Regions:
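Hydrophobic alpha-helical segments and helix pairs
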Residues: 102-140
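Small-residue-rich segments of transmembrane alpha-helices in multi-pass membrane proteins
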Residues: 82, 147-154, 233-237
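Membrane-interface helix/loop boundary segments of multi-pass membrane proteins
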Residues: 131-181, 215-222
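Phosphate-recognition beta-domain surfaces
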Residues: 187
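Hydrophobic transmembrane alpha-helices
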Residues: 124, 128, 141-145, 210-217, ...
Length: 287
């Protein structure tokens, strides 16, 4: 698995400048001008994701994985129900918390809502969970379960998930894109670990989210419930960021988004408890 990650990183740092220049060229020609609004870090992250997708097939071949069952996954006849329930279990607690934050003055509603931005995050909430759950809970956790016991595999997969999402270079790290800009972004990706409050409020929440998603995957032997959970968290937090304005920052209690801080951590734990209760009383599932 280390070789797989190394290949992804090497591909990402080399490809990110090419993707950035191609996007800027298209925007300059009037083709998809919205591409000009994305900074280099966005293309760096997309290059890493592209590398992860491209190298899946040789990775699976090397591990001799021929079907989803080899990764501990089974057919889910109730996939639509699990998808919807997962979405509600994650989104509703976040929305309730957001209402409280607005009522207490921590956030205020914007006078003008950015509907185009809302549309973009809605698309993100539909696509990203499919890709990331297939990678993190489908592939990575499945591979770890082949050599580790259940909870060590869950903890390690959650750590991988949180580290990858927490690694992010500060804004404006790359002001002029060169061939080595990917290496510069990679070097600065660890800067956030130098801020203890951000580590406590951000990394910890992401780690717990990884635990919840892995738990949902194992309890159902399917990716549909974690996909729903993931989509609910993204949509509820991202749409709120577009229609509301934060009035104060109170790390480690509340960070720059509704997925960073001890308050969001508590909200995620509520979702986990509700998930466990629902699965305990849900009708028996057939595979």
């Amino acid at each position: 698995m280390l070789g797989y990650f190394a290949a992804i990183i090497f591909f990402g740092v080399l490809t990110a400048p090419l993707l950035f220049w191609a996007a800027q060229g298209l925007a300059a020609q009037g083709i998809l001008p919205v591409l000009a609004t994305f900074d280099f870090e966005s293309f760096f992250h997309r290059a890493l994701l592209l590398g992860a997708l491209l190298f899946i097939w040789p990775f699976l071949r090397w591990l001799r994985i021929k079907s989803a069952r080899d990764l501990g996954l089974a057919r889910n006849r109730h996939w639509l129900r699990d998808l919807a329930i997962g979405f509600l279990l994650s989104a509703l607690p976040v929305i309730c918390c957001e209402i409280v934050l607005v009522q207490t003055g921590v956030y205020s509603m914007r006078d003008t809502w950015m509907w185009v931005a809302v549309g973009k995050v809605t698309l993100t909430a539909a696509v990203v969970p499919l890709i990331e759950e297939s990678l993190f809970r489908g592939l990575f956790l499945g591979v770890l379960l082949r050599g580790l016991r259940r909870w060590p595999a869950v903890v390690l997969s959650a750590a991988i998930f949180s580290i990858i999402h927490f690694l992010k270079a500060p804004d404006q790290t790359t002001t002029s894109v060169q061939w080595n800009s990917g290496f510069v972004s990679l070097a600065h990706a660890f800067d956030q670990f130098g801020e203890p409050l951000l580590v406590l409020g951000g990394f910890t929440t992401l780690f717990v989210i990884g635990l919840i998603l892995a738990d949902a995957r194992l309890l159902t032997q399917s990716l549909w419930l974690p996909i729903g959970l993931h989509a609910g968290w993204i949509l509820a937090s991202s749409v709120f960021a577009k229609i509301a304005r934060r009035e104060l920052l109170a790390l480690p209690w509340l960070g720059k988004s509704m997925l960073i801080g001890l308050v969001p951590l508590a909200v995620c734990l509520v979702s986990w408890a509700l998930l466990r209760v629902w699965l305990r009383h849900a009708p028996p599932r057939e595979t």
